[in-house]
């Protein structure tokens, strides 16, 4: 998130140096929501009290989903550079687009589907396992779309393992996956966990390729 802010600040500096927008200088108000949906809404409300006219963010999926709903009530333009859940910009239940929300990245369905296509069609794998964090919109979204697409192509998902936020030991899940004999493992998780998962996979003898 800090990298995103640094780039926003650089862009702001460049825009203001070139006269701003419609002759007006821009100002960024930044608050840390700590990756929490409730805290994100609290920060948004505080920023509205300070007179913001547009929202850039959030960075990750769960708080962005909360902000998408909240910003709609204010009819405030919102753009995210990195939140990938389809529901950020589209409500599948009502088949409506969230007209005030925009994104500058791909979606969970796109990522999960394309990775399944790559694994099955390009790499030739027919048996896959998945390990992902449960209760996390981003991780679950990618896992679900990968599984559905891989099976629709004719592949077999031999195992799906989950872990909880804050876990640091994945050996039990990885040992279970090893016993199911996959040719490849899909690991749609954040880099902090992925590094540990890969190291522990090696320690239990799970030597198949990981995709993520």
State the predicted function of each range:
Residues 76-102:
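Flexible loop/hinge segments that line or gate small-molecule binding clefts
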Residues 33-38, 54, 60-65, 83-89, ...:
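Solvent-exposed loop/turn segments at secondary-structure junctions
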Residues 142-212:
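Extracellular/periplasmic bilobed ligand-binding domains
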Residues 6-28, 151-156:
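Signal peptide-proximal N-terminal region
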Residues 1-5:
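Short, small-residue-biased leader/transition segments that mark boundaries at the very start
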Residues 47-59, 77-81, 129-133, 181-191, ...:
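Periplasmic-binding protein-like
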Residues 96-165, 184:
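An alpha-beta-alpha
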Residues 25-49, 111-114, 161-177:
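Structural motif
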